[in-house]
Every structure is written in C-alpha cells, then in structure tokens.
C-alpha cells in the first residue's frame, strides 16, 4: 500500500484508522463480544441459524471475518459469502456447493441440492466436522434465496443440523423476515444479536486500541475534547469515527501539529459535510 505522509510524523508503522475490515484492528466492544459468543455457541452446538443485525458501519463485516477466522482456527469447514445478491436460487446453491467443497454439481437444481446434501452428510455426520456458511450483507437476499437457505438448514441428523448458517444483515432483513410468507424461516432463528452504536467510552477505547496496534504501543494524539468531537460528529458509528480520525491526522500533519484538538476535528467534519452533501454522505455509508 501507498505510504501515507503522516505515518512517520506521528511515529506510526501502519495506518491506524483504515476502514478496510481487518481482524487485527477490530476492537471488540462488549456488544460485539456478546454477538460473537452467541453466534459461536449456535454454530459450535450445531443448532442451525444465527442472525446478527446492525446498521451500516457498526462492524458487521469485521465481525463476520473475525468469526470466519475463528471457525477455521477451530478446524471447522467455514465459508464466507460477502455479496449474496444472486439472480436465482440455483446460482446461490451452486456457489454454496462449490464454496463448501462439494465434489461436483449437477445441471439441475434438485441434482445439485442432493449432491450438496450428500456432501454435508459426509462431512458433518460421518467425519464429525462442523460445517458453517457465513453470509454478509444478507439483507440483499430475496425471499426465494431465503427459502433455499431454509431448505439447507433443514438437513439434519437426529440431534444436530448438518449446516450451520450465520447471517449478518442491515435492519431491512428484519422487515423482510416479518412477512407472513417467511414465518417458517423466522422460526428457525436460534439466536439473534444486534450491533448498536458505540458509547463515548467505547470510542475512547477503540481509538486507543487501534493507535497502539499501529504504533507499537504508543498513545494517540487526540485530546479528550477531540474524541468527544469525533463521537458527536460520527454519532457513535465506528466506520464514520475512523474516517474522521483519519482525516484529522492528515490535517494535523499538514499543520504540523502533534496534538489534535477538538477545533481541528470540527473543521474536518464540517469539510466532510460540505464536500459530500448530506445525501451523498448517507449514500457513502451504505
């Protein structure tokens, strides 16, 4: 990646506030930990379906990647689908079959479904391996695709599900699942979690944590008032807070200031608002 001009100025080895999901930089709040524990329990106990809801920018994608890695480390067969807007149930089914290592697929939907079921049986029932599919941005799944997923989590032995499914989704999924036609799917959810916005204390802790990872243990340059300003403008959203912190570093570097005060954060936030316009800012967060 390109060297950022402010890294040396602030004594950083890496970019502290990148919005690219990275497990190393992911700060686990109590709420993230709870969602992680509940979801890991559903998967580990092979109970089937877990859902994690949250607004955009609350850390769903980071948590999805962290869970995926945790499952791989535990020896599970885990697959992560990050953009599930498939045109047909058949295309989603073929993707899932390939991702989970099904030896072959069939021309027909029914054929592929049977092959996947046999594969899941061999892995989960015979070999005793936990098989898990994690889907990020699951709010884009149409009802016909949700119906396919319901079929897949119906595959079971006498005491456990063959496939464990974890959905990470924006709140639209709640509305979709409220439809009477999806009552069957909804009733399969074993545990649901919701990621909320950060508190001011959590934002303080997140900035401190990320700066320590990027600097090798040093303290960040934001005053307490500057952190409060980031909190106010980001409204507790982790992604927006990281963007504001990053932009503030750049401006502080240009002004050759080693300490970052609230007025600098305010001007960065103002500049961001004016350049994005409110509508674009909302679109940008999508």
What are these regions (language model features)?
Residues 45-67:
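Walker A/P-loop nucleotide-binding motif
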Residues 98-100, 171-172, 180, 198-217:
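Conserved AAA+ ATPase "sensor/coupling" helix adjacent to the nucleotide-binding pocket
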Residues 68-71, 173-188, 197:
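Short regulatory helix/loop adjacent to the ATP-binding pocket of P-loop NTPases
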Residues 81-85, 176-177, 190-203:
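Conserved AAA+ ATPase "SRH/arginine-finger" region at the nucleotide-binding site
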Residues 7, 88-92, 103-148, 156-161, ...:
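Mid-core helix/loop region of P-loop NTP-binding domains shared across ATPases and GTPases
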Residues 1-46, 282-286:
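A short, basic N-terminal segment
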Residues 12-17, 76, 87-106:
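Conserved NTP-binding/hydrolysis module of P-loop NTPases
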Residues 5, 212-286:
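C-terminal alpha-helical "lid" subdomain
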């Amino acid at each position: 990646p390109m060297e950022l001009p402010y890294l040396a100025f602030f004594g950083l080895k890496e970019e502290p506030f990148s919005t690219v999901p990275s497990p190393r930089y992911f700060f686990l709040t109590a709420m993230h930990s709870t969602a992680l524990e509940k979801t890991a329990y559903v998967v580990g106990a092979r109970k089937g379906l877990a859902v994690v809801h949250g607004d955009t920018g609350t850390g769903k994608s980071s948590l999805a990647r962290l869970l995926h890695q945790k499952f791989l480390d535990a020896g599970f067969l885990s697959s992560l689908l990050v953009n599930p807007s498939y045109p047909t149930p058949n295309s989603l089914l073929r993707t899932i079959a390939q991702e989970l290592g099904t030896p072959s697929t069939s021309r027909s939907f029914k054929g592929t479904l049977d092959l996947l079921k046999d594969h899941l049986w061999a892995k989960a029932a015979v070999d005793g391996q936990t098989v898990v599919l994690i889907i990020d941005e699951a709010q884009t799944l149409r009802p016909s695709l949700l119906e396919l997923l319901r079929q897949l989590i119906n595959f079971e032995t006498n005491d456990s599900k063959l496939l464990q499914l974890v959905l990470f989704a924006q709140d639209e999924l709640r509305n979709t699942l409220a439809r009477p036609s999806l009552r069957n799917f909804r009733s399969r959810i074993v545990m649901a979690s919701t990621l909320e916005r950060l508190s001011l204390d959590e934002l303080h802790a997140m900035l401190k944590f990320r700066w320590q990872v990027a600097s090798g243990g040093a303290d960040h340059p934001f005053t307490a008032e500057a952190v409060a300003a980031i909190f106010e403008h980001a409204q507790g959203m982790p992604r927006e807070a990281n963007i504001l912190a990053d932009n503030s570093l750049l401006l502080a570097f240009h002004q050759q200031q080693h300490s970052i005060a609230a007025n600098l954060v305010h001007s960065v936030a103002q500049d961001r608002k004016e350049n994005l316009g409110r509508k674009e800012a909302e679109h940008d967060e999508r």
